[in-house]
């Protein structure tokens, strides 16, 4: 899988995103879920994920948070409290650190990673993974993502693709259970049958 951006930017990216999560959650006192909502809906997440130098290595953690908050319209930079000096990494710092690494390694959106591994789950992995190296966190993400895909396909097969003997217009598929890439419109312009969606293998 192709990394999201040049590896030379990665060390700074990890430090800065780690600092952003630490500062936002511990110094600003933002709930994790709220800050993550701000982060993934801001341009910062997209541009950081593409390796734009201004964001991955041109801003500190505090500056990233200030920019995220500015873009989402919640606070001015002058409202941001000073960062507290720390002698060691916090759980939130580690979570931001491995999140930056995983996004770089897999080249997917931060939002996609956090859908597979919510922030609270990432924090709970700290005791077992913080000494194992960042690549082990990526392994956990890959395993969880693969399991989610299998479970999603299974749900689609059981509930959406099973024949319905009571319905003369079979096949009928619950489109909400099928990933868009696995569904296609089975109706044609010349068909008199009702419009339906069919799951593809």
Regions found by a protein language model. Name each.
Residues 7-67:
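N-terminal interaction modules that seed assembly of large macromolecular complexes
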Residues 53-87, 91:
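Long, compositionally biased
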Residues 155-169, 198:
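Short basic helix-loop element that most often maps to the first helix and adjoining turn
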Residues 50-53, 176-190:
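Recognition helix of helix-turn-helix/homeodomain-like DNA-binding domains
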Residues 65-73, 192-201:
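DNA major-groove recognition helix of helix-turn-helix/homeodomain DNA-binding modules
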Residues 84-143:
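A charged, amphipathic interaction segment
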Residues 39, 164-182:
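Short alpha-helical DNA-recognition segment
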Residues 26, 161, 172:
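Alpha-helical residues within the helix-turn-helix
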């Amino acid at each position: 899988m192709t990394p999201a951006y040049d590896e030379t930017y990665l060390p700074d990216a990890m430090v800065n995103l780690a600092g952003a999560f630490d500062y936002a959650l511990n110094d600003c006192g933002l709930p994790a879920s709220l800050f993550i909502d701000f982060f993934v809906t801001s341009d910062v997440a997209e541009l950081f994920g593409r390796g734009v130098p201004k964001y991955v290595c041109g801003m500190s953690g505090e500056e990233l948070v200030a920019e995220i908050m500015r873009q989402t319209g919640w606070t001015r930079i002058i409202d941001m409290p000073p960062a507290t000096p720390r002698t060691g990494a916090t759980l939130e710092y580690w979570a931001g650190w491995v999140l930056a690494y995983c996004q770089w390694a897999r080249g997917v959106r931060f939002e996609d990673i956090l859908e597979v591994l919510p922030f609270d789950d990432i924090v709970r992995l700290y005791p077992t993974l913080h000494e194992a190296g960042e690549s082990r966190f990526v392994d956990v993400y890959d395993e969880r993502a693969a399991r989610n895909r299998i479970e999603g396909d299974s749900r689609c097969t059981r509930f959406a693709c099973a024949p319905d003997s009571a319905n003369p217009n079979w096949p009928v598929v619950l489109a909400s259970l099928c990933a868009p890439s696995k569904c296609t419109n089975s109706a044609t312009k010349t068909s008199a049958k009702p419009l339906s969606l069919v799951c593809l293998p």
